[in-house]
Protein backbone atom coordinates (compact mmCIF):
# COMPACT_ATOMS: atom_id res chain seq x y z
CA UNK A 1 0.00 0.00 0.00
CA UNK A 2 1.32 3.43 -0.95
CA UNK A 3 1.49 5.58 2.18
CA UNK A 4 2.12 8.77 0.23
CA UNK A 5 5.09 9.57 2.48
CA UNK A 6 7.74 9.72 -0.24
CA UNK A 7 9.28 13.20 -0.25
CA UNK A 8 7.62 14.23 3.00
CA UNK A 9 9.59 14.96 6.17
CA UNK A 10 9.08 13.08 9.44
CA UNK A 11 10.46 14.54 12.66
CA UNK A 12 11.03 11.85 15.28
CA UNK A 13 12.23 12.40 18.84
CA UNK A 14 13.94 9.69 20.88
CA UNK A 15 15.17 8.14 17.64
CA UNK A 16 18.51 6.68 18.73
CA UNK A 17 17.33 3.20 19.75
CA UNK A 18 14.50 0.75 20.30
CA UNK A 19 11.12 1.93 19.00
CA UNK A 20 12.49 5.33 17.98
CA UNK A 21 15.20 3.96 15.71
CA UNK A 22 12.80 1.39 14.25
CA UNK A 23 10.30 4.16 13.51
CA UNK A 24 12.93 6.30 11.80
CA UNK A 25 13.97 3.47 9.50
CA UNK A 26 10.36 2.54 8.79
CA UNK A 27 9.65 6.08 7.58
CA UNK A 28 12.89 6.10 5.58
CA UNK A 29 11.84 2.90 3.79
CA UNK A 30 8.69 4.75 2.72
CA UNK A 31 10.83 7.49 1.20
CA UNK A 32 10.32 10.11 3.90
CA UNK A 33 13.19 12.42 4.75
CA UNK A 34 14.04 12.46 8.44
CA UNK A 35 14.71 14.90 11.24
CA UNK A 36 15.77 12.76 14.18
CA UNK A 37 17.07 13.63 17.61
CA UNK A 38 18.21 12.21 20.93
CA UNK A 39 19.12 13.83 24.23
CA UNK A 40 22.29 11.81 24.75
CA UNK A 41 23.01 8.79 22.53
CA UNK A 42 24.59 10.54 19.55
CA UNK A 43 26.67 7.55 18.43
CA UNK A 44 23.56 5.41 18.10
CA UNK A 45 21.67 8.25 16.41
CA UNK A 46 24.48 8.62 13.90
CA UNK A 47 24.22 4.94 13.05
CA UNK A 48 20.47 5.29 12.48
CA UNK A 49 21.10 8.32 10.27
CA UNK A 50 23.61 6.42 8.14
CA UNK A 51 21.22 3.50 7.70
CA UNK A 52 18.49 5.91 6.64
CA UNK A 53 20.75 7.73 4.17
CA UNK A 54 21.63 4.36 2.65
CA UNK A 55 17.94 4.05 1.82
CA UNK A 56 18.19 7.22 -0.26
CA UNK A 57 16.61 9.83 2.01
CA UNK A 58 17.91 13.06 3.50
CA UNK A 59 18.53 13.16 7.25
CA UNK A 60 19.00 15.87 9.87
CA UNK A 61 20.31 14.23 13.05
CA UNK A 62 20.81 16.41 16.14
CA UNK A 63 21.27 16.28 19.88
CA UNK A 64 18.16 17.84 21.38
CA UNK A 65 16.65 17.73 24.86
CA UNK A 66 12.91 17.95 24.25
CA UNK A 67 12.38 19.54 27.67
CA UNK A 68 14.34 22.59 26.45
CA UNK A 69 12.04 24.79 24.38
CA UNK A 70 14.89 26.77 22.81
CA UNK A 71 16.67 23.57 21.77
CA UNK A 72 13.51 22.19 20.16
CA UNK A 73 12.92 25.47 18.32
CA UNK A 74 16.49 25.38 16.98
CA UNK A 75 16.09 21.74 15.89
CA UNK A 76 12.86 22.48 14.03
CA UNK A 77 14.39 25.59 12.41
CA UNK A 78 17.38 23.56 11.20
CA UNK A 79 14.98 20.95 9.84
CA UNK A 80 13.07 23.57 7.88
CA UNK A 81 16.27 25.20 6.63
CA UNK A 82 17.71 21.90 5.39
CA UNK A 83 14.65 19.86 4.46
CA UNK A 84 12.12 22.61 3.76
CA UNK A 85 9.19 21.24 5.74
CA UNK A 86 7.86 19.10 8.58
CA UNK A 87 4.88 16.97 7.63
CA UNK A 88 4.86 14.37 10.39
CA UNK A 89 5.92 14.65 14.04
CA UNK A 90 6.33 11.49 16.11
CA UNK A 91 6.94 12.12 19.81
CA UNK A 92 8.74 9.03 21.08
CA UNK A 93 11.25 10.52 23.55
CA UNK A 94 10.18 9.42 26.99
CA UNK A 95 11.14 8.97 30.61
CA UNK A 96 10.14 5.76 32.36
CA UNK A 97 8.80 6.47 35.83
CA UNK A 98 8.93 3.01 37.39
CA UNK A 99 8.89 3.83 41.12
CA UNK A 100 5.85 3.43 43.33
CA UNK A 101 4.27 6.78 44.14
CA UNK A 102 5.51 7.00 47.74
CA UNK A 103 9.01 5.87 46.77
CA UNK A 104 9.75 7.86 43.61
CA UNK A 105 9.92 11.39 44.95
CA UNK A 106 9.10 14.74 43.41
CA UNK A 107 12.14 14.70 41.12
CA UNK A 108 10.83 11.64 39.28
CA UNK A 109 7.37 13.19 39.08
CA UNK A 110 8.63 16.43 37.54
CA UNK A 111 11.03 14.63 35.19
CA UNK A 112 8.21 12.43 33.91
CA UNK A 113 6.08 15.50 33.20
CA UNK A 114 8.98 17.36 31.58
CA UNK A 115 9.91 14.62 29.11
CA UNK A 116 6.56 12.94 28.45
CA UNK A 117 4.28 16.00 28.38
CA UNK A 118 6.34 19.17 28.07
CA UNK A 119 8.49 17.56 25.36
CA UNK A 120 5.55 16.95 23.00
CA UNK A 121 4.27 20.44 23.87
CA UNK A 122 7.52 22.02 22.64
CA UNK A 123 7.58 19.88 19.50
CA UNK A 124 3.97 20.60 18.59
CA UNK A 125 4.29 24.33 19.29
CA UNK A 126 7.16 24.49 16.81
CA UNK A 127 6.01 22.15 14.04
CA UNK A 128 2.34 23.10 13.87
CA UNK A 129 2.95 26.51 12.25
CA UNK A 130 4.85 24.71 9.46
CA UNK A 131 2.02 22.22 9.02
CA UNK A 132 -0.62 24.94 9.05
CA UNK A 133 1.33 26.81 6.39
CA UNK A 134 1.18 23.77 4.09
CA UNK A 135 -2.32 22.75 5.21
CA UNK A 136 -1.24 19.18 5.90
CA UNK A 137 0.17 17.45 8.93
CA UNK A 138 0.24 14.41 11.16
CA UNK A 139 0.98 14.43 14.90
CA UNK A 140 1.62 11.02 16.48
CA UNK A 141 2.16 10.71 20.22
CA UNK A 142 3.09 7.69 22.31
CA UNK A 143 1.14 6.63 25.39
CA UNK A 144 0.94 3.12 26.87
CA UNK A 145 -1.29 0.76 28.83
CA UNK A 146 -0.50 2.21 32.28
CA UNK A 147 -3.48 4.61 32.28
CA UNK A 148 -5.87 1.70 31.76
CA UNK A 149 -4.22 -0.93 33.95
CA UNK A 150 -3.16 1.35 36.81
CA UNK A 151 0.54 0.74 36.26
CA UNK A 152 2.07 3.19 38.73
CA UNK A 153 0.58 6.60 39.58
CA UNK A 154 3.28 8.74 37.97
CA UNK A 155 3.50 6.65 34.82
CA UNK A 156 -0.30 6.46 34.51
CA UNK A 157 -0.58 10.23 34.96
CA UNK A 158 1.77 11.17 32.13
CA UNK A 159 0.58 8.43 29.78
CA UNK A 160 -3.06 9.45 30.20
CA UNK A 161 -2.05 13.10 30.00
CA UNK A 162 -0.64 12.63 26.51
CA UNK A 163 -3.91 11.00 25.44
CA UNK A 164 -5.86 14.04 26.65
CA UNK A 165 -3.39 16.40 24.99
CA UNK A 166 -3.70 14.50 21.72
CA UNK A 167 -7.48 14.57 21.73
CA UNK A 168 -7.66 18.26 22.58
CA UNK A 169 -5.09 19.08 19.91
CA UNK A 170 -7.00 17.04 17.34
CA UNK A 171 -10.01 19.33 17.69
CA UNK A 172 -7.94 22.49 17.50
CA UNK A 173 -6.00 21.66 14.32
CA UNK A 174 -8.58 19.73 12.30
CA UNK A 175 -9.57 22.78 10.23
CA UNK A 176 -5.99 22.95 8.94
CA UNK A 177 -6.08 19.39 7.53
CA UNK A 178 -3.89 18.17 10.40
CA UNK A 179 -4.60 15.06 12.43
CA UNK A 180 -3.39 14.14 15.91
CA UNK A 181 -3.43 10.57 17.15
CA UNK A 182 -1.82 8.46 19.81
CA UNK A 183 -0.43 4.93 20.02
CA UNK A 184 -0.44 2.96 23.26
CA UNK A 185 2.10 0.13 22.95
CA UNK A 186 2.16 -2.74 25.37
CA UNK A 187 5.39 -4.57 26.14
CA UNK A 188 7.44 -4.41 22.95
CA UNK A 189 10.49 -6.56 22.23
CA UNK A 190 13.58 -5.20 20.52
CA UNK A 191 13.23 -7.74 17.70
CA UNK A 192 10.76 -10.23 16.27
CA UNK A 193 12.82 -13.04 17.80
CA UNK A 194 12.64 -11.54 21.27
CA UNK A 195 8.90 -11.05 20.88
CA UNK A 196 8.37 -14.77 20.27
CA UNK A 197 10.68 -15.86 23.10
CA UNK A 198 8.97 -13.80 25.78
CA UNK A 199 5.85 -15.77 26.70
CA UNK A 200 6.83 -16.08 30.37
CA UNK A 201 7.38 -12.33 30.70
CA UNK A 202 3.97 -11.06 29.64
CA UNK A 203 0.89 -10.66 31.81
CA UNK A 204 -0.94 -13.90 32.55
CA UNK A 205 -4.25 -12.49 31.31
CA UNK A 206 -2.89 -11.13 28.02
CA UNK A 207 -4.53 -13.09 25.17
CA UNK A 208 -1.54 -12.84 22.82
CA UNK A 209 1.14 -14.42 24.98
CA UNK A 210 4.27 -12.64 23.80
CA UNK A 211 5.85 -9.22 23.56
CA UNK A 212 4.98 -7.13 20.56
CA UNK A 213 7.28 -6.79 17.58
CA UNK A 214 8.58 -3.26 16.86
CA UNK A 215 7.12 -3.41 13.36
CA UNK A 216 3.68 -4.08 14.82
CA UNK A 217 3.86 -0.58 16.29
CA UNK A 218 5.66 1.18 13.45
CA UNK A 219 3.12 -0.14 10.95
CA UNK A 220 0.42 1.72 12.89
CA UNK A 221 2.58 4.86 12.84
CA UNK A 222 2.94 4.63 9.07
CA UNK A 223 -0.80 4.23 8.66
CA UNK A 224 -1.57 7.23 10.88
CA UNK A 225 0.99 9.30 8.96
CA UNK A 226 -0.35 8.27 5.57
CA UNK A 227 -2.71 9.96 3.15
CA UNK A 228 -5.25 7.23 3.89
CA UNK A 229 -5.59 8.26 7.55
CA UNK A 230 -6.88 11.76 6.85
CA UNK A 231 -10.27 10.94 8.41
CA UNK A 232 -8.77 9.52 11.61
CA UNK A 233 -7.99 11.93 14.44
CA UNK A 234 -8.16 12.12 18.23
CA UNK A 235 -7.76 8.36 18.57
CA UNK A 236 -5.49 6.24 20.73
CA UNK A 237 -4.55 2.94 19.10
CA UNK A 238 -3.68 0.30 21.69
CA UNK A 239 -1.10 -2.16 20.35
CA UNK A 240 -0.82 -4.38 23.39
CA UNK A 241 -1.65 -7.98 22.59
CA UNK A 242 -5.04 -7.60 24.23
CA UNK A 243 -3.66 -6.65 27.65
CA UNK A 244 -6.44 -4.06 27.70
CA UNK A 245 -9.53 -3.83 25.51
CA UNK A 246 -10.82 -0.35 24.76
Region locations from a protein language model:
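Conserved glycine-rich cofactor-binding loop
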Residues: 16-18
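Conserved glycine-rich Rossmann-like NAD(P)H-binding loop of the short-chain dehydrogenase/reductase
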Residues: 32-47
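The beta1-alpha1 cofactor-binding region of Rossmann-like NAD(H)/NADP(H)-dependent oxidoreductases
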Residues: 42, 63-75, 106, 215-216
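Substrate-binding pocket helix/loop in short-chain dehydrogenase/reductase
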Residues: 100-101, 105-113, 202
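Alpha-helical segment proximal to the catalytic Tyr-Lys
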Residues: 129, 171-175, 230
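Catalytic loop of short-chain dehydrogenase/reductase
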Residues: 138-161, 166-175, 187
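Short, small/polar-rich loop/turn modules that mediate ligand/substrate recognition or access, typified
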Residues: 174, 179, 232-234, 240
